[in-house]
Amino acid sequence: MAQTTINEQTLVNEQRLLAYDCFQNTNKVGLLSALEYLDFVNHLVKSNQIKYLLVPSASQTVYQHVFFDHFRFLSFDNNLLSGFGLAIRLHKEAETVFMLVEKTKQTETEIKKLLEAVKQFSGLKLVVLLVNSPFENKRTKLSYEIVKIIKKHGYQYKRYCRKNFEKKFFNTWNHQKRKQKTKNNLFFVELNSQFAFGTSMANSNSFDLSFTSFKERFNTENNLDIDVHFNVPHKYLLKNLESIKHHLQIDNNTIWKQAFINFAGQLLLYFENLQVFAQEASTLQVNAIVIKQDAYFIVEVMKGYNYDNNCICLLEANKDQNVGLTTASTNTLIGDIKQYEPCFFIEK
């Protein structure tokens, strides 16, 4: 990587910008993942065409520190299904959900399930940005078979390097939106890694990422063989640093941490804009969405749907097989539901 001379003031600004106090060895996974795709994310933020970005939970804190409160990053489990749930939630507003998904052995299976599930809806808008996982020992591409299936369902697939992404991505996406205003609109995009082949968690243990100076940071990036990152600061992000407030938007999703078993293959969503379950005597408003899928699929979709913890999601469950679970019905008062308490709709 060519040496670049940057004055000390710029380094100080960039140091604050990166807020590398969270780039410690304890979050090496998030750091590697964020560094690898930071230029892609920076382009999305600068475009002013997206309101937020879903990112894997390991990287969310890193991204939020880098961008401070200029932009919101939502933290999700690394799968497509949570993004699908959020797309369901927002489809009436015709908002597009953008999400970064690290490719795993389950990704192609999740894509197939997603393509089947969206047939029950219309007007969903979801952009899936597929990236490499720092846990994987090799860089993977979607198989020819799954790309063929995506296109057979009428959706777009593209693979971009950084330069082509900056030149072509939004033109392609906006053109596609104009063509399919009422139909489902899914766009699967694979992003080429900014790291050299083979850089992963498997061979990163020798790298000390708790750097205390910028000289050390540049040396670390050289060792990682990063070819483009941080040669120059991102000017867009350097403005108004003195007045920046560190406001992190972290979604805990504590309501969904219980293991779910033996559910019927249906998802029922009962929701109202509750201001996090306000204690008032109104009954649940019913809006049912039925998805005939396995329980894992349903629960992951629910996580995305309830991204702001501002609605109540209920599963139809078999009471005999789920003894002790909270029950609710359309007569249940909102004030009777404890904050973040999982409720399972039983009564017909």
UniProtKB/Swiss-Prot annotation:
On the tree of life, the source organism's domain of life is Bacteria
Return the protein name: Uncharacterized protein MG343 homolog
Species for this entry: Mycoplasma pneumoniae (strain ATCC 29342 / M129 / Subtype 1) (Mycoplasmoides pneumoniae)
